[in-house]
A protein has these predicted regions:
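An interfacial alpha-helical scaffold signature
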Residues: 1-137
Length: 137
């Protein structure tokens, strides 16, 4: 799978998870992507305010990133690269920011747009990683 295909698979898995968050296999697939598939993120820590909370925007497709940059002037000043979502999560925790915002945009398809509080996302990743480790023994 090419990097672009992996990012597209991440995007599809995120959509599936948001439609059915209690589906065990989709949750495992999402954790797998969070651990191994890079997201599009600012090279340096970059946060925006959403609903009164400071969040770090990350993207699972180029189109949503371009849409965000078109409406967010400060985003156009950033250098956007592929980064590990876990590295971004680590940075935002150290900076005491609220969480990760996936695929922020003002209009269009919101099926892959969500906000994860860092504490909840860490618990989610740890739970499914531990579950998988227990199953694989």
């Amino acid at each position: 799978m090419t990097e672009n295909q992996e990012l597209q698979a991440f995007d599809e898995t995120l959509k599936e998870f948001l439609k059915e968050p209690d589906h065990f296999l989709t949750s495992l697939a999402l954790v797998n992507h969070l651990q191994r598939t890079p997201v599009l993120a600012a090279q340096d820590l970059y946060a925006v305010e959403v609903e009164g909370k400071k969040v770090v925007p990350v993207f699972t497709n180029e189109q949503d990133l371009q849409s965000f940059k078109a409406t967010q002037e400060s985003a156009r000043e950033q250098i956007w690269i592929e980064r590990s979502s876990l590295d971004v999560l680590t940075q935002l925790v150290q900076a005491e920011l609220f969480g990760l915002a996936f695929n922020l945009k003002e209009d269009g398809d919101f099926s892959n747009t969500t906000l994860f509080a860092s504490s909840e996302l860490i618990q989610f990743i740890n739970y499914f990683t531990q579950t998988l480790n227990n199953l694989l023994g």
